[in-house]
Design a protein with these regions (language model features):
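Charged phosphate-binding loop/patch that engages nucleotide di/tri-phosphates or the phosphate backbone
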Residues: 147-166
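Charged, low-complexity interaction regions
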Residues: 141-146
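Leucine-rich solenoid repeat scaffolds
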Residues: 74-118, 122-135
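Alpha-helix initiation and N-capping motif
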Residues: 24-25, 48, 126-129, 149, ...
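Extended, small-residue-rich solenoid/repeat segments and analogous flexible loops
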Residues: 1-67, 161-166
Length: 166
């Protein structure tokens, strides 16, 4: 019987092994439930939409391209997790904030406080906060969606001010 695995991004060692046919999300939720040590887990590109990651220790994990929309990250430790390339690594503490559904797509807006600044993921947009603010102004202006995004941006800025914007 073949199995699927979560490996350490740095050493390549198997951190958790799941049953054949399990999605990464299912395997990760099972690993968290069994209190597996997932520090440094290679989760790049994983579909973790609406996953229950509450309480997980994902310090130093590779989250490049992972879909975290709607995921429960309550009490999850994401310090030092890698968002990839130009976006840097998450700071220690509370680097993640999510709100929604909102905007023209009625989707979740995610923000990450990294060592290089605040990164936003909203729909197909992934970029720094300043670029997101400009895109919202250009696309939505003073419409209801624009106003809703503006309020979310204020919350994101406050969250970053409280929890350690670099």
């Amino acid at each position: 019987m073949t199995t699927t695995q979560i490996k350490n991004i740095y050493t390549g060692t198997v951190m958790y092994e799941g049953e054949s046919g399990m999605t990464t999300r299912q395997m990760l939720e099972k690993a968290i439930a069994s209190q597996a040590d997932l520090r440094g887990a290679n989760l790049g590109g994983a579909d973790l939409y609406s996953a229950n990651l509450g309480g997980a220790d994902l310090r130093g994990a590779d989250l490049r391209g992972a879909d975290l929309r709607g995921a429960n990250l309550y009490s999850a430790n994401l310090g030092g997790a890698n968002l990839g390339g130009k976006f840097g690594k998450l700071i220690e503490g509370r680097p993640y904030f999510q709100c929604g559904p909102l905007g023209s797509r009625s989707d979740y807006l995610q923000s990450f406080i990294t060592d290089k600044g605040i990164v936003i993921k909203a729909g197909c947009f992934t970029g720094f906060l300043d670029d997101f603010v400009a895109a919202v102004k250009e696309t939505h202006g003073d419409s209801d969606h624009g106003k809703e995004y503006a309020m979310a941006i204020l919350m994101i800025e406050e969250h970053a001010a409280i929890w350690g914007q670099p």
